[in-house]
Amino acid sequence: MPNTARFITPVDDPGSAPVLFRRVRPDRGHGAITSARLTVSARGVVEAWIDGEPVSPDVLTPGWTSYEFRIRTVTHDVTRLVGDDVVVALVIGNGWYRGHLGWMGNSALYGDELAGWAELRIVFEDGHEQVVGTDDSWSATGSGILEDDLYDGQTIDARLRPDLAALTDGEPVRVVDVDPALLVESEGPAIRRQELRRPEKIWQAPSGATLVDFGQNFVGWVKVRVQGPAGSTVTVRYAEVLEHEELATRPLRNAKATDRFVLSGGVDEFEPTFTFHGFRYAEVTGWPEGSPLSEDDITGVVVHNDLRRIGHFRSSNELLNQLHANVVWGLRGNFLGVPTDCPQRDERLGWTGDLAVFVPTATFLYDTKDFLSEWLRDLALEQAHLGGTVPVIVPDPLKGVDIGFPPLDATAIWGDAAVWVPWALWEAYGDVAVLSRQFDSMTAHGRRIRDLLSPSGVWDAGFQFGDWLDPTAPPEEPWNSKADNGVVATACAYRTAGMIAGAARALGRQDEAVEFDTMAASLRSAFTREYVEPDGRIHSDAPTAYALAIAFGLLDGTARQQAGDRLTEIMAASGHHISTGFAGTPFITEALSSTGHVADAYRLLLQTECPSWLYPVTMGATTVWERWDSMLPDGSINPGEMTSFNHYALGAVADWIHSVVGGLSPLEPGYARVLIAPMPGGDLTSAETTLDSPHGRISVSWRLDGGDLVVHADLPSEVEGLVRLPGRDDVVVPGGSHVFTAPMSNLVLG
């Protein structure tokens, strides 16, 4: 039966969060109800209720898509809620559709008119089906939500909240003209509350405000239980860090990150579910006198897409364990709606470059297949809209907005997300369908790169982000890196062409495989000719240049070893401090360890002085920072405009932690065949890595025992392992439990 529901909106816009409702009486004479399903959508975000009960635990439904091209619908089984006579209510928030988006202060970039859509299908025991959809017979009323914005927060007046089970009269609605072909069923996991956190500390700041520390930087909101004078307001502000003993809001830039709760005079419970904040600390003002805020009054609510954790790592080094935990929390906070760069300031956008470098880590830690596959649909649609150029933000709400960059064509890393992300999904989960669906997008990006190459065969023209946020770059010039942009872009283009050729072979597309193998070979030759000196040095002599050339396979034999040796010299000269940005950081430890410099890779990984991965850990970080020095050693905040304390890109090193420190990596897509090759180093005496692969749980653990390295491996029955230990011949093992030893004399410990 075709749907007849239409998008509707109040005739008179209330300004914020209208309730759209209708009373539904099931048809008589058809026996008992056997099933009832409610499908909802919105231009905005929607919470659906039946007789005052939420239909699901989902929040911020239906998430964020490229609204010009598709709008998600979400279906819920509501059989238990549909009785003789019920009120179906939709509360509509601004969300990503009408709220603020981007750092330029813009709002309503998709449109200034909220709209809700719903279809209730009731099936009776005689087979009769009753369908009730949104149309102009519905009504509208207020919700008690006076303001709602993802960046700025939410204001709720408890005195104005309606009883959603008792709605009768309301204001008229009108139908909004939306092409029904835009509606698509959601494929990915919903956004949901994941965890409740009690405060670890509540105290008074010098300003007199009450501060709450939840002990972890996370994303979501607080819910509050309070009783006070009617009309009085409790205000909650949020931030990731403190500075000068007060809430540090400067890094939020223009995001107000403020929730306000207007009290009714009775016992009120508030939960601002039409916004989200990135925070560890909350500042509370206006709390009723005579009853100080306690741990029972305020709760942190962790919110993100409902992803299943599949990968774990733990070692004997607690600082390294905390770094890994920080990477996990960074993913949790930024996989909300779409994979974002940061969750707290006036940005929170789907920057493609951040995900491109982080995706191997993401696919190991969580089952991200459906979440990222759906995001890739929007990438392909946005790319097609631009004639083959991959935008740097997906979804891209900033079309036509001056964002301070020149008009962008294809860019290395950021544009490469069109290829690197589906490739990583295939490697992690073994489902070739994602390659098939994204193949046109992948090849379009590769061909656009080819069109932009210079006559010399390298990619050295046009705007590039380069090694973004190189720690030696000035705070206000994050693009000003040591590594030459042409070196970075050409190396990435080679990697991209090789992946497209590999995807073509996996799909049986021989013509495209030859096309992109040829492109890769040409890029490799041009890279060597234009950028590699006779003594093995690479143009710009920067760590990122060597890391990419080695990790991407641009060098062979002597040249490769020369590059690894030179990289080691540079790292030693820097005191083994990290000196790479977005481009080089994910690959520098791999470049060192794969050229025989495992000890130097560990010295880099375990460095605690700034800049380093562990410096933020020593400063109390519980997520990965945007900058190596987002907080300076004296506790002050980096003066740069971009200073996020929850930015997962630099946490991409976790991929190397899993594969080299932990010793587990795939040899075939979906971990059908795996490499077991831990390389101990530093002060580590043990480590354990586990993965719930498509074939079952894989576990690799090792410990130093006397004079031996002892490795335990557990493989599912259908998974084959290749065991590679220092000083030992490779061994192929079937599924099952295995123990191996190697003399410690074969190890080079850092």
Language-model segments: what does each one mean?
Residues 57-68, 244-256, 369-475, 612-635:
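Helix-terminus loop motifs that line ligand-binding clefts
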Residues 135-137, 141, 292-326, 332-333, ...:
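Active-site acid/base region of carbohydrate-active enzymes
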Residues 88, 155-157, 346-352, 357, ...:
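C-terminal capping/lid segments that line or modulate ligand- or cofactor-binding pockets
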Residues 36-40, 220-240, 271-274, 284-287, ...:
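Alpha-helical support elements that line or immediately flank enzyme active sites
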Residues 1-345, 353, 370-373, 387-395, ...:
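Extracellular/oxidizing-compartment recognition motifs
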Residues 108, 112-119, 132-165, 177, ...:
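Non-catalytic C-terminal accessory modules of carbohydrate-active enzymes
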